[in-house]
Amino acid sequence: MTTFEQFPVWRGFNLQNLYVWKRSDKPFDEKDFQTISEWGFNYIRFPMDYRIICGGTDWNIIDEKAMERLDQGIEYGGKYNIHICINLHRAPGYNVNVPEPTNLWTDKEPQEAFARLWGIFAERYKDIPNIRLSFNLVNEPPDISEEVYAAVMKKAVDAIREKNPDRLIIADGRHNGNSPSGLIRRLGIAQAMRGYYPSTVSHYKAEWVKGAMDFGPPEWPLLSDTAHSGKEYLWENSYKLWEDGINSHNVHVGEWGAHNKTPHDIVLRWMEDNLEIFKEHKLGWAIWNFNGSFGIVDSGRPDVQYENINGYMTDRKMLELLQKYLKY
């Protein structure tokens, strides 16, 4: 049985077909699921923009064509033995990158819309078992209090459980996915952390991140006159905060990876230190992209010799590094 107390170790990617309204909304490609499965991975997260699901900014409308595309993605997951996690990356009243006109954390209307959307998903997919499907409520909430966060998430949890009492539910950590919450855990749901530390490596020259264009040249391990910091530094400064949840096996790494402006050799060294931690603590994970600037295909890295594998321009070194850590 797949529950928040028996959280499997899934490994895979985010697919962004429902990610940004009018920009990246497109049908899922069955070949992506087939290839991800053939390469040994078993998890895909769908970060979604509520405006795609609603066909715009009116929360009371559901775009049935968008829902059918979501149905198709979930069906592909089942066909290729891949667990699908659906996530509201942009929710009514909140987006980590671009502010919404209302506030999910303080305003009644977006809170009601948020819970209603999750109730709709719960009803529609109630017959799909947890081994195939989970719900990740909202992407990377801000640095709000535990009390506020838990109160808003409880509304969505209640809406889900009214329709689908046993659904596996995941909540991202506060402070952009970096801080665990005891109150969230009391709701009987799992939590997801991030693997982007330090951002000077993961988001070097990422134009959507404030200050990233001014980061100095990245290095890994971090070197100074007094320190040589690699895997132990990552654990102490990022993952150790999650130790209770890690030891209880009810957390995973919902996003991680590095943008294509960081030199490839540095990215691979940094990734392997992260992967060693994931292996030691039996953590599941998902790279932010499958195809894109963080991904293993079509990532646009100037210092990679890409190979055509299954019709994908593939970063073989990164692919093989990830595959090295698929068994634990």
What is the role of each PLM region?
Residues 25-44, 59-90, 97-134, 152-163:
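An active-site-proximal structural segment forming one wall of the substrate-binding cleft
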Residues 1-25:
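Boundary/entry segment of secreted carbohydrate-active catalytic domains
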Residues 106-232, 236-259, 280-283:
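Active-site region of glycoside hydrolase catalytic domains
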Residues 48-62:
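Glycine-rich, proline-tolerant flexible connector loops at the mouths of alpha/beta enzymes
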Residues 263-328:
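Aromatic-rich peripheral "rim/lid" segments of glycoside hydrolase catalytic domains that contact
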Residues 28-49, 242-245, 275-277, 281-286:
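Catalytic domains of carbohydrate-active enzymes, especially glycoside hydrolases
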Residues 47-49, 88-93, 173-175, 286-295:
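Short, solvent-exposed turn/loop segments enriched in Gly/Ser/Thr/Pro and often Arg
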